[in-house]
C-alpha cells in the first residue's frame, strides 16, 4: 500500500480515454483468444470428468492467464486490475473484496488530491497575503523615511539659516569693532598730531624766548656801559622800557589771555611737561630762592608758554615803533626805567639759564662717569647761589660749561634708543669666534645667569660721522625678522663710550663652512634635505617680511648641536619694496653672487638670495664651492661654462645689462651641471638645482615653491633635526685661520679688518699673551 501511495499520480482525461480504448482493444483480443481456446477444448473433450477437469483447468488458466500478468505490469499493479472489466460470473468473493478495497483507496486518493489542491490554493493565497503585507510594510517604511528626510532637510535649512545669521552677526560685530578701532586709531593719530604740533610750538616759543633773552642780555650790557660812561647814548632806551612797564603793556596782556583761550587744548596736553620743567628749574636754582619766587616764576613761565609766535612778533613791532616815537624822553626817566627793567631781565635770564643747564634726557646706567661730573657742578652752583661767575677760591671744572644751545646740538640722537641697556662688563669673554661683515663675534658668558652667548661688536671706526647705517640696518632687520631658523637677538649692550655697541645673540656651536672643512664625509642626502628645508624656511620668512639678506653663504649659516640651522650676519641685509629701486650691485660674496649682479644690474629682488641658496645646495652635496671664481670675470666664465651661455631668448633683457654691452663672453652651448653631481643628486634634486640656478630672475624659483618641491618628498626622506650627528664645536677652540673663501663686499665704506689690537684702549680688550689670536681668558678688561 505504501508503494502504491508513493507511485500514485493523477491522470489527465486524455490519458484515461486512451487507457480505456487500449483496454477495450485488449479485452477484444482476449475474448477472441478465449473463444478460440474454448473451441479447441470442446473438440478435444472425451468425457465429463475430463471436461470438468478441463473446465477447472480453464478456470485456472483464465484466472492465471498471461494477459492478466502482462496487464498488471503495464498498468502498474493493482490499479489496472480494478479497471479491467471481467465477466461477473468469473469474479470470486476474494476479488470482490479486493475490488472494494481498491475503490476505497481510490476514494481516499481523490479526497487527498482534493485536499492537496485546496492546500495549494491556501498556500498561494497565504503567499499573496504575505506579499501584500510586505508591500504595505515597505510603503510605510518609505513614507516614514521620506518624512524623516523632509524633517532633516527642514532642520538643516534652519541650522543653515541660523549659522548664516550668526555669521552675518559676527561679520557685523567685526565690522563694528574695526570701525571703532579705526576711530580710536584716528583719534590717537589726531591726538599725537596735536601733541606734536604743541611740542613744536613749545620748542619754537622756547627758542624765541632764548633769542629774546640773548637780545635783552645784550641790551643790558649796553645799558650798563651807558650808565658808567657816556650818558648821551641812553636817551633812546627809556621810552621802550617805559612802554614795556607802563600802561601801554596792558593790551598786550589782554591779547595773551585771548590766545590762551584759543590754545587751551594745547596747554592741557603740555601741562605735565611744563610742571616737570618748572620743578627742575626750581631745584636747579640757588639756595637763596624762596617758595614765593618759585611760584612767581612758574606763573611767568605759564604766561610766556601760552603766548604764540604772532603775539611776540606784534609785541616786538610795537616796541620798535614806540622807540622811534618816544626818542626824545628825559635822562632821569630813562635811568629809573633802565634800572627797573634791567633787574627784571637779570632775574629772568638767570632763571632761563638755570633751566637750560638741566638736561631732560635721563641718565643711563652704562655712563655713570658723566653723572659724577654733573653732581660736582650742582654742588658748585649751590655754594655760590647769587653769583653767575665763580670766584677765585671756588672750584673751576676742567672743561668750561657749554651754552644751552650747544648742549642740545651735541646730544646724540640715538641716545634715547639705548637707555636702559646693560653694560658689556656684565659678560665674561671666553674667546673670539669670527669676524663678520661689519663686526667681530665673541663667545661670552653672562655673569648673572651663566648662559653662553655670542657678542657681536659693531664696527664704529667712523662714529664721528654718526651711528653707521649698516649697524642700524642690521639691528633693525634682525629684530624684525625673528624666526626659529634665524639667529635670535637677546639684547643690545654698550661699553664705556657710545662707540662700543654690542649685539647679544644666542650662541650656536657651528657654522657650516668651518664644519664642512673638518668633516671627513659629506652630509647624507637626508641631512642635506633637512638643512635645505630649514634654510628655505628662514629665507621665506625674510622675503615674506620684505627683507633681502644679500649675503647668504655657508659661513653665515649656523648649525646647533640639536640640528637647527639659523641664518646669521645681517650686515648687508636691507628692506625692499614694490616697485623695485636701484640698489648697489656690489653685494653678496663673489662665489654666491647671482649673474644679474655680476653683469651690473641695479634693480634686483629676492632672486639674488635664491641663487645663493642654489650655490649653498651644491656646496652641501660636494663639500666644495659650486663656482669658486677669482674675480668677477672669472666668476661669470665659470657660471657660463657649467650652465651654458645665456641669450636674449632664455633671459629677456640680457642684452641690456651694462656688462653685456661692454664686452663679449665665450659661447658655451650646453648645460654641463649634471655631470658634476652624478649619483649625489636624483632627477628631482637636479630639477630643483636648475630652478635655483635659472638665469632669468623672473623665472627663478622662490622659497615657498622650493619648500613644496617633490625632491623633499622622495626617498630618502629628510631626517629629524634631533638625529643629526654632533661634532666638537670649533668656535669653542682656539681660532684657526679661515680658508680661501673671499671676503664679502664692504659697500664702499672702507672698513678695515678689526682685530684684537684695535680693541685696546677702546673700552675692553682680551687679556691674552698672544696678539691677534684670542684664547679663553678671564674676562673683559674695561676702561672707563
Curated annotation (Swiss-Prot):
Description of post-translational modifications: Phosphorylation at Ser-115 creates a binding site for 14-3-3 proteins.
Activity regulation annotation text: Phosphorylation at Thr-437 or Tyr-438 inactivates the enzyme, while phosphorylation at Thr-584 activates it.
Family classification: Belongs to the protein kinase superfamily. CMGC Ser/Thr protein kinase family. CDC2/CDKX subfamily.
Known function: Plays multiple roles in cell cycle progression, cytokinesis and apoptosis. Involved in pre-mRNA splicing in a kinase activity-dependent manner. May act as a negative regulator of normal cell cycle progression.
Record field: compositional bias (Basic and acidic residues): 18-60, 114-131, 138-227, 238-263
Keywords in alphabetical order: ATP-binding, Cell cycle, Isopeptide bond, Kinase, Nucleotide-binding, Phosphoprotein, Serine/threonine-protein kinase, Transferase, Ubl conjugation
Gene name of this polypeptide: Cdk11b
Annotated S-S bridges: none
Entries under SMART domains matching the protein: S_TKc
Phosphoserine: residues carrying this PTM: 47, 72, 115, 270, 471, 578, 741
UniProt organism field: Mus musculus (Mouse)
Descriptive protein name: Cyclin-dependent kinase 11B
Cross-link (Glycyl lysine isopeptide (Lys-Gly) (interchain with G-Cter in SUMO2)): 630
Comp. bias intervals (Acidic residues): 290-353, 372-381
Record's catalysed reaction(s): L-seryl-[protein] + ATP = O-phospho-L-seryl-[protein] + ADP + H(+); L-threonyl-[protein] + ATP = O-phospho-L-threonyl-[protein] + ADP + H(+)
Cofactor(s) demanded: Mg(2+)
Modified residues (Phosphotyrosine): 583
Superkingdom of origin: Eukaryota
Binding locations of ATP: 433-441, 456
One Pfam family cited in the UniProt record for this chain: Pkinase
Residue ranges, compositional bias (Basic residues): 95-113
A single BP term in Gene Ontology: regulation of cell cycle
UniProt-recorded Gene Ontology molecular function terms: ATP binding; cyclin-dependent protein serine/threonine kinase activity; protein serine kinase activity
Amino acid at each position: 500500500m505504501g508503494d502504491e501511495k508513493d507511485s500514485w499520480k493523477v491522470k489527465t482525461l486524455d490519458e484515461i480515454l486512451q487507457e480505456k480504448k487500449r483496454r477495450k482493444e485488449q479485452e477484444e483480443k482476449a475474448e477472441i483468444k478465449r473463444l478460440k481456446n474454448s473451441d479447441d477444448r470442446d473438440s478435444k473433450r472425451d468425457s465429463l470428468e475430463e471436461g470438468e477437469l478441463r473446465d477447472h483447468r480453464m478456470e485456472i488458466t483464465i484466472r492465471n492467464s498471461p494477459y492478466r500478468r502482462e496487464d498488471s505490469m503495464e498498468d502498474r499493479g493493482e490499479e489496472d486490475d480494478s479497471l479491467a472489466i471481467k465477466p461477473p460470473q468469473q469474479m470470486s468473493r476474494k476479488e470482490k473484496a479486493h475490488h472494494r478495497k481498491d475503490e476505497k483507496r481510490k476514494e481516499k486518493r481523490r479526497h487527498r488530491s482534493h485536499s492537496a489542491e485546496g492546500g495549494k490554493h491556501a498556500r498561494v493565497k497565504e503567499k499573496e497575503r504575505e506579499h501584500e503585507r510586505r508591500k504595505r510594510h515597505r510603503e510605510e517604511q518609505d513614507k516614514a523615511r521620506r518624512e524623516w528626510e523632509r524633517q532633516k532637510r527642514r532642520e538643516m535649512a534652519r541650522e543653515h539659516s541660523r549659522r548664516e545669521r550668526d555669521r552675518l552677526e559676527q561679520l557685523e560685530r567685526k565690522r563694528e569693532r574695526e570701525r571703532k578701532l579705526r576711530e580710536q586709531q584716528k583719534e590717537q593719530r589726531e591726538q599725537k598730531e596735536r601733541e606734536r604740533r604743541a611740542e613744536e610750538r613749545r620748542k619754537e616759543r622756547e627758542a624765541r624766548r632764548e633769542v629774546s633773552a640773548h637780545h635783552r642780555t645784550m641790551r643790558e650790557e649796553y645799558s650798563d656801559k651807558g650808565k658808567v660812561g657816556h650818558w648821551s647814548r641812553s636817551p633812546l632806551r627809556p621810552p621802550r622800557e617805559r612802554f614795556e612797564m607802563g600802561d601801554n603793556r596792558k593790551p598786550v596782556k589782554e591779547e595773551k589771555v585771548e590766545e590762551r583761550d584759543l590754545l587751551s587744548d594745547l596747554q592741557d596736553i603740555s601741562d605735565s611737561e611744563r610742571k616737570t620743567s618748572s620743578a627742575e628749574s626750581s631745584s636747579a636754582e640757588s639756595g637763596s630762592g624762596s617758595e614765593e619766587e618759585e611760584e612767581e616764576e612758574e606763573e611767568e613761565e605759564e604766561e610766556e608758554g601760552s603766548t604764540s609766535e604772532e603775539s611776540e612778533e606784534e609785541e616786538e613791532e610795537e616796541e620798535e615803533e614806540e622807540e622811534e616815537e618816544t626818542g626824545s624822553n628825559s635822562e632821569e626817566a630813562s635811568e629809573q626805567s633802565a634800572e627797573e627793567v634791567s633787574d627784571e631781565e637779570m632775574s629772568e635770564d638767570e632763571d632761563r639759564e638755570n633751566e637750560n643747564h638741566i638736561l631732560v634726557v635721563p641718565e643711563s646706567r652704562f655712563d655713570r662717569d658723566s653723572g659724577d661730573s654733573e653732581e660736582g657742578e650742582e654742588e658748585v652752583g649751590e655754594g655760590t647761589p647769587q653769583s653767575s661767575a665763580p670766584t677765585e677760591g671756588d672750584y673751576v671744572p676742567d672743561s668750561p660749561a657749554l651754552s644751552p644751545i650747544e648742549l642740545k646740538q651735541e646730544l646724540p640722537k640715538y641716545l634715547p634708543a639705548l637707555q636702559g641697556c646693560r653694560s658689556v662688563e656684565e659678560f665674561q669673554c671666553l674667546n673670539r669666534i669670527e669676524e663678520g661683515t661689519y663686526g667681530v663675534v665673541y663667545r661670552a658668558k653672562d655673569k648673572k645667569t651663566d648662559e653662553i652667548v655670542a657678542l657681536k661688536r659693531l664696527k664704529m671706526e667712523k662714529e664721528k660721522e654718526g651711528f653707521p647705517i649698516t649697524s642700524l640696518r642690521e639691528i633693525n632687520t634682525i629684530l624684525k625678522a625673528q624666526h626659529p631658523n634665524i639667529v635670535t637677538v637677546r639684547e643690545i649692550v654698550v661699553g664705556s663710550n657710545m662707540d662700543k655697541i654690542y649685539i647679544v645673540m644666542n650662541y650656536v656651536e657651528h657654522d657650516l663652512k668651518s664644519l664642512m672643512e673638518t668633516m671627513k664625509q659629506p652630509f647624507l642626502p637626508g641631512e642635506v634635505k633637512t638643512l635645505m628645508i630649514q634654510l628655505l624656511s628662514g629665507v621665506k620668512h625674510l622675503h615674506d617680511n620684505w627683507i633681502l639678506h644679500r649675503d647668504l653663504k655657508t659661513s653665515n649659516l649656523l648649525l646647533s648641536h640639536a640640528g637647527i640651522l639659523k641664518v646669521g650676519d645681517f650686515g648687508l641685509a636691507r628692506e625692499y619694496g614694490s616697485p623695485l629701486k636701484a640698489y648697489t650691485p656690489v653685494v653678496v660674496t663673489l662665489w654666491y653672487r647671482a649673474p644679474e649682479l655680476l653683469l651690473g644690474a641695479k634693480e634686483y629682488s629676492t632672486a639674488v638670495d635664491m641663487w645663493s641658496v642654489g650655490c649653498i645646495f651644491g656646496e652641501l652635496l660636494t663639500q666644495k664651492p659650486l663656482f669658486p671664481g677669482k674675480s668677477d670675470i672669472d666668476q661669470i666664465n665659470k657660471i657660463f661654462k657649467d650652465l651654458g651661455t645665456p641669450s636674449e631668448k632664455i633671459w629677456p633683457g640680457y642684452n641690456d645689462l651694462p656688462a653685456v654691452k661692454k664686452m663679449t663672453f665665450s659661447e658655451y652651448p650646453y648645460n654641463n651641471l649634471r655631470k658634476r653631481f652624478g649619483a649625489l643628486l636624483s632627477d628631482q634634486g637636479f630639477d630643483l638645482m636648475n630652478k635655483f640656478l635659472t638665469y632669468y630672475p623672473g623665472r627663478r624659483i622662490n622659497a615657498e615653491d622650493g619648500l613644496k618641491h617633490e625632491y623633499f618628498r622622495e626617498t630618502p626622506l629628510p631626517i629629524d633635526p634631533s638625529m643629526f650627528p654632533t661634532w666638537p664645536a670649533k668656535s669653542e677652540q682656539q681660532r684657526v685661520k679661515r680658508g680661501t673663501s673671499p671676503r664679502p663686499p664692504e659697500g664702499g665704506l672702507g672698513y678695515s679688518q678689526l682685530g684684537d689690537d684695535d680693541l685696546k684702549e677702546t673700552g675692553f680688550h682680551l687679556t691674552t699673551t698672544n696678539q691677534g689670536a684670542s684664547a679663553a681668558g678671564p674676562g673683559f678688561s674695561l676702561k672707563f
